[in-house]
Amino acid sequence: MPPKGWRKDSEGNYPNTSYIKEQEKISIDDLLFPKSIITSLAKESLQNAFQKGEEERRITVSKDAALAMQRSATVFVNHLLMFARMNAKDSNRKSCNDQDIMAALDTLGLGALESILTGKMQEYQEAILWKKQNKVNNAVPGADGDIAMEDDEDDEDDDGREGADADAEPKSRADTEVQQGNAENDKLDGPPVNQEQVPSTRQNDLDLSTKKQKTE
């Protein structure tokens, strides 16, 4: 049994839920576009109407003018959408595309707006493509030249290593000569030769030679 308060229709049947929803009153206030967007679009169109070189003027839109544009824009778009849906239905499609909108403009006698609408659509698609490319570039590491910087750093590291190897070559040669001298002294059961002691041994030889000359 339906809830209390529901009445039968003219045929004597209780209304179902879908029937009640269809009977609900929908006013234009429920379909209005945001007033801020409509006002900003109106100001932008007025700014573009000014000639180049003129000073920018501050444009103000009154409350009544904003309400009138809001209502008229809502009525126009819904009226245009009705004809676009009819074209889509004739083509056995459930959704409308841009071609349906263009055909609806021709039906309403507003074919002159097709070129303007086409240009705006191209600008919108280019803006979307530009945003996608920026997202891809920001997501890929090294897309802004980081790879080149890393290559430069690697080259600098290689140059530094080569310089360090070149400086180490003379030291390694001196060390090998000292080690060879120590090995020969070890064979003769003598003390190991140190590089720092080389000048002192030469001085001792000179002292011995002078002593021999004096004794003679």
Swiss-Prot record:
This is DNA polymerase epsilon subunit D. GO terms for biological process: DNA damage response; heterochromatin formation; leading strand elongation. The keyword Nucleus applies. Residues 194-203 have a biased composition (Polar residues). It comes from Kluyveromyces lactis (strain ATCC 8585 / CBS 2359 / DSM 70799 / NBRC 1267 / NRRL Y-1140 / WM37) (Yeast). As accessory component of the DNA polymerase epsilon (DNA polymerase II) participates in chromosomal DNA replication. Residues 161-176, 204-216 have a biased composition (Basic and acidic residues). GO terms for cellular component: CHRAC; epsilon DNA polymerase complex. The lineage of its organism: Eukaryota, Fungi, Dikarya, Ascomycota, Saccharomycotina.
